[in-house]
Amino acid sequence: MSTQKSTTLYPHPFSKAYWRDAVAELKDIHMLVFAALMIALRLVMKQVSIPITPFLRINAAYFVNALGAMVFGPVFAALCAAVTDVLGYIIRPDGVYFLPFILTEIGGSVVFALFLYRAKVTTTRVMLSRFSINLFINVLLQTPIMMWYYALYMNGKQYTFTMAVPGMIKNVLMFPIESVLLTLFLGVMLPITNRLGLTYSVGHAKDALKFSKKQVVTLVM
């Protein structure tokens, strides 16, 4: 006997029901197919960069990452991130494969899911998801992993704070740009995923992903 899939939206991910629904996505054949599509698209988009300035470029894969995480949740997102990381290296090896780097792939995907999956997707949530990834994943997690990598593979050369500063500056500069582009992208995609029955925020999707004056000021500042 088939059971009807839950379409509940949650105000936060700190509930058993939220995680029960996230795990249940693994049993949904439609989600399996969608996840395979997202992995394939993410591998392709990793090769695509959008130039902002001669020194700043946006990797287009983060659009696919956010879309997938919003649809299938944190459990699937973590698995897809791990598969994408390994396949990406197999398809296009670049130096030594250092397994801890997979944590940044998984972390970014899970953070997107925690903010966007089974939630009323708003501009604030999109901005917070991007800010959390830039700070906690790209800086606070990436830095010690880089230090570990240098200690093992760079002949004793240390990864210093000075070496991490350009990456920190880049994340600060890219945050407003990435937030705006991701909000616009999800604003287009969310009505489509709603119609396909992949997300359940029907009724407020169109108006929720608009920038208020306060949000514009925050991004500009």
Regions inferred by a protein language model and the residue ranges of each:
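Loop-helix junctions at membrane interfaces
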Residues: M1-M221
